[in-house]
């Protein structure tokens, strides 16, 4: 089903019949782009759908930036940012879920048509797949960055989560392309995915993972076989078919190496990869809230939402004596905010949050030097109660202090730091809205707080 047919289908649905309002909205989008749909529309828009337990945001952003670098008209919908000339949403603003209803899908279609986009890069989460929102989207390329059955265990069982992710690759048109990142799951599930459809398939992984999990390296399209991670970024070597490429980026954290290889594999599959253009693209790429790094006065400030993976990467730098102390600013999501989905109010969810909090503090006890406990979408729970619970799990094994105001916590962590230290601001990534009671919220973005503090300090 082509994109125009999908638009017509959605417009005909009962809940989306207010066509006059949509027409006005569409005309506004076209006016914002300075064109009319008839003059600007492309007959065929290439759609790239990217799902996975992690990494999908980074892969989507790299692909989008590369396409723009080539002069292509690309629209990006990711949880870190939406980049669409026809939208009213500010670039670099976080988006909780890229699309959550048929109405959202229709708006995206109208935007890409108004802009005359050649490419749509769309981050896809499991909720959208489960709701059937992806069923009729004519994806040209479908990507699985990785898979961890426990990634969303407060919402799905391992079996349910696996079935949902696998379903994204079933019933595809033969002309479509499939790209699978092989990292956190077993060889048997990879074999299931390879049999899920009749499309052409590409796999990317690392030499280490392929060896440990017993996968034939000849069957892997893109193989990461060398990686050096330093405070200056990542350097790596990748085998792609019969060629070897050297890649270099200022992007940090070991886990991003496979994200970079994943984006490369998608572009290679599409026949668009050029090593020189790609290296230029990734050299200084920054993705909001994902390994966002500030290097000032010998300190390194990291904003990221992936606690375990970032701590692992920082520990490696510490073992090599590239960094000194690791300071972490962290909070924990509460429950009960009025507009959250019902599942965030259940007894099971509350129990799962306590389990997650304990796990996070266990990691901190092993790997960090100072912890600043603060607010992070506490909802109905009191910030102090959450922080006291977290402090209890730390068992005085690591220095910690409670600073309820998040901005003040970030400020103190930076001011307390010494040359060679790392300040890791965890949990919220690029999000701005912080739900601080059952009925209220405030606006705070970690990167803006960091930049404000650095400016005040003259750093």
Regions found by a protein language model. Give the residues of each.
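Residue-level signal for inorganic ion chemistry
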Residues: 50, 123, 145, 161, ...
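A short, gly/pro- and small-residue-rich
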Residues: 139-146, 161-167, 201-205, 435-457
């Amino acid at each position: 089903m082509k994109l125009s047919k999908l638009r017509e289908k959605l417009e005909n649905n009962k809940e989306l019949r207010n066509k006059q309002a949509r027409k006005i909205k569409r005309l506004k989008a076209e006016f914002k782009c300075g064109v009319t749909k008839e003059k600007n529309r492309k007959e065929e828009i290439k759609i790239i759908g990217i799902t996975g337990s992690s990494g999908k945001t980074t892969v989507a952003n790299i692909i989008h930036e590369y396409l723009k670098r080539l002069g292509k008209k690309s629209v990006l919908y990711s949880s870190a940012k939406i980049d669409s000339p026809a939208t009213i949403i500010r670039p670099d603003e976080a988006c909780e879920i890229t699309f959550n209803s048929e109405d959202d899908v229709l708006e995206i279609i109208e935007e890409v048509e108004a802009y005359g986009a050649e490419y749509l890069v769309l981050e896809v989460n499991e909720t959208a797949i489960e709701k059937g929102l992806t069923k009729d989207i004519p994806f040209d390329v479908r990507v699985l960055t990785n898979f961890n059955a426990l990634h969303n265990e407060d919402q799905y069982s391992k079996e349910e989560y696996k079935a949902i992710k696998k379903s994204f690759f079933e019933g595809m048109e033969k002309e479509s392309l499939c790209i699978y990142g092989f990292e956190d799951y077993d060889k048997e599930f990879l074999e299931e995915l390879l049999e899920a459809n009749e499309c052409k398939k590409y796999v990317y992984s690392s030499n280490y993972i392929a060896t440990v999990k017993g996968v034939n390296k000849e069957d892997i399209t893109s193989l990461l076989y060398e990686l050096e991670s330093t405070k200056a970024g990542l350097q790596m070597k990748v085998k792609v078919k019969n060629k070897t490429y050297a890649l270099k980026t200022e992007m940090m954290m070991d886990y991003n190496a496979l994200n970079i290889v994943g984006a490369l594999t998608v572009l290679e599959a599409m026949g668009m990869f050029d090593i020189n253009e790609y290296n230029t693209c990734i050299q200084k790429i920054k993705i909001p809230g994902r390994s966002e790094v500030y290097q000032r006065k010998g300190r390194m400030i990291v904003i990221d939402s992936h606690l375990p993976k970032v701590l692992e990467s920082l520990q490696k730098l510490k073992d090599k004596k590239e960094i000194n102390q690791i300071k972490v600013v962290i909070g924990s999501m509460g429950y009960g905010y009025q507009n959250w989905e019902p599942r965030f109010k259940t007894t099971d969810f509350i129990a799962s949050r306590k389990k997650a909090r304990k796990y996070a503090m266990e990691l901190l006890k092993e790997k960090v030097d100072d912890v600043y406990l603060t607010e992070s979408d506490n909802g109905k729970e009191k910030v102090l109660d959450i922080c006291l619970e977290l402090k209890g799990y730390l068992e005085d094994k690591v220095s910690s202090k409670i600073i309820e105001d998040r901005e003040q916590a970030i400020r103190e962590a930076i001011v307390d730091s010494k040359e060679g230290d790392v300040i890791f601001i965890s949990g919220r990534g690029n999000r701005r809205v912080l739900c601080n009671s059952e009925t209220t919220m405030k606006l705070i973005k970690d990167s803006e707080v960091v930049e404000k503090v650095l400016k005040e300090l003259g750093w």
